[in-house]
């Protein structure tokens, strides 16, 4: 019986020692993983066109389409490649809805998320250098 009580502190020390070890990746490892996903999206226009074909209610006859080349921008805890977009698309009834803006956020050179909330887009796209995007204006269903 006395030996059983002597073994309890030893077992308890092993259990507590297991709690003090770090189970997940370190902060530096997480940052390295995040940075490794920053690959320039060579096909950003094709990705945007494929996405907008389904995102827009009426992708035909878009006017005033402009896009910025992807640039590293602060998103969340680090930087991501972001391409900014301006366009005037039609609604289901064929009426133009007015100029809209969006930001395409890329992870590992692929479109990960499209931000369309004005406050977020304004923050992500401040200082973006836009150029004409005739491929979007020529888009069909």
Give short role names for the model-derived ranges.
Residues 12:
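Structured alpha-helical
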Residues 1-8:
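Bacterial N-terminal signal peptides that target proteins for export
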Residues 20-141:
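Cystatin/cathelin-like cysteine-protease inhibitor module
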Residues 15-18:
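C-terminal motif of bacterial Sec signal peptides marking the signal peptidase cleavage site
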């Amino acid at each position: 019986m006395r030996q059983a009580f002597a073994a309890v502190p030893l077992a308890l020390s092993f259990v507590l020692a297991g709690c003090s070890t770090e189970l997940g990746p370190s902060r530096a490892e997480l940052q390295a993983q995040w940075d490794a996903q920053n690959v320039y999206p060579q096909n950003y226009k094709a990705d945007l066109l494929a996405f907008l074909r389904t995102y827009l209610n009426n992708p035909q006859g878009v006017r005033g389409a402009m896009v910025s080349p992807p640039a590293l921008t602060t998103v969340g805890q680090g930087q991501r490649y972001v391409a900014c977009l301006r366009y005037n698309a039609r609604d289901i009834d064929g009426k133009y809805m007015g100029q809209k803006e969006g930001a395409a956020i890329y992870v590992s050179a692929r479109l990960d998320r499209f931000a369309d909330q004005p406050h977020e887009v304004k923050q992500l796209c401040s200082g973006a250098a836009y150029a004409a995007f005739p491929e979007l204006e020529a888009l069909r269903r």
